[in-house]
Amino acid sequence: SELYIIPEVTIPGGHVDFFLVSAKNKKVKDFVGIELQTMDTAGTVWPERQRLLDEHGIYVPKDDINNKKPFGMNWKMTAKTILVQMHHKAQTFENLNKHLVLIIQKPLYEYMRKEFSFSHIQGVRVGDAVHFHSYDVVEEDNGLHLALDTRVSTDTNGVAECLGLNAEANVELKDIIALLESKLLDEYRLTLIV
């Protein structure tokens, strides 16, 4: 089997960041969708950047240093946006009997559990279309490494419940396979070094 990482594939419900595709002779055998989400910010970091440069003796205009515009993590909008996107895409993957994996940072996952309705999401079920994988940064071997922290899953209705919605993206498996096969380019072939 050959493995490919195919970026930006359009499906009903939007774009999927990546597909991990298992193929043989450039024919799709299996696939999983992968969404990556990092934290967004609100405001601008520019004034803080300018103050840092000033502290290190690098000239910046005084107006930039005195700018009091705040910035920070936009937790609510980031979490809500990705849950809405996952809901739009979940039904497509559910109809195909395939998985869509959301990869997020541990603090964002913890925020989502606290601020949205996640109490119904417990454990991992192979039959669920939507999987959440949260990663943490851990100190190991005198360095920092990513480590899988949490794995849970749900279905389309479960994502809707997270958002407080009452839960159509219909596409045929053959159509997705044809789209993926058209993108099985050598530049996307995954080479594992052991």
Task: Please place each PLM-identified region on the residue numbering.
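Active-site metal-binding core of divalent-cation-utilizing nuclease and nuclease-like domains
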Residues: S1-P47
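A signal for specific C-terminal beta-sheet/loop modules enriched in small/flexible residues
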Residues: V32-Q37, Q50-R51, Q122-H131
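Short beta-strand-loop-alpha-helix junction that forms the active-site gateway
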Residues: E35-G57, G72-W75
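Non-catalytic C-terminal interaction segments of nucleic acid-processing enzymes
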Residues: V60-V194
